[in-house]
């Protein structure tokens, strides 16, 4: 039996395989609202064969968006825009739906990547970003405003309100974004956090605010539903956040009931030097799992079925999260199951597509004729 296509349970959520479609920013919203692009994108990948699809980084405040095109869940309009998409997914797919809740912090007010990705000045239609400290992401950029006590409370409450909206929408799980140089990661990293109060300096202090946000979201979301987190295991910059600190963070998250840790890396500094290669971040998931016993997801240049199978079989991670590989092959899960001898759920409209040599790929399928 394929390990990749064996079941796993995250709190009260039972998944038939170990594959998640990773959250991928689409930069295609207007005023934070999902639209026809998201309808097509989400419904397509909900039929990928993955056990869980995670909606892209969904921002808890308008000023917390990376770009003007980023998705939000911070008011009635953004909540209402997601609802018909989720109704459609539920109608046609059994895939669990998670949502990644995020705040860009000092990396907010940026152009879309295909428009250059640089900071948008306030004078050109951008907005004032906020962060742990008044330290810009890049030299020459306008610095963020350092969040004061009321600001910290406001952002924490925005995460809570987004979690409650996610529950109203029937979302199955939440992933908190504390990676890739966004707000929660900015608090963790000594590169971006220069505070001298209880939220800066020592490792315990730098972890304090992200852990407070996790606690608040966990308390706001139903107890039977899982809450995971995405981390950057290293900044890839000397003197920055690293794997040893990540493991301490993971231990604190375990005490608080985290249901999975999605182990990525980088994003907090343009000085990063990342040694890209197939599965280059898998050792981070493995180290976190071995040190804490927390369920981990491996992510990053996982593209082949055998590669994903080996990651799970070897115990390096409990699950795999795929992003660009899913965009390139939106039926990646089907093809992986066919290669590994697994089984996936598919809508009856597509049953006839299974290979003639693999009539069990979609389970029991029968057709009447006359």
Regions found by a protein language model. Give the residues of each.
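Flavin-dependent oxidoreductase catalytic cores
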Residues: 1-370
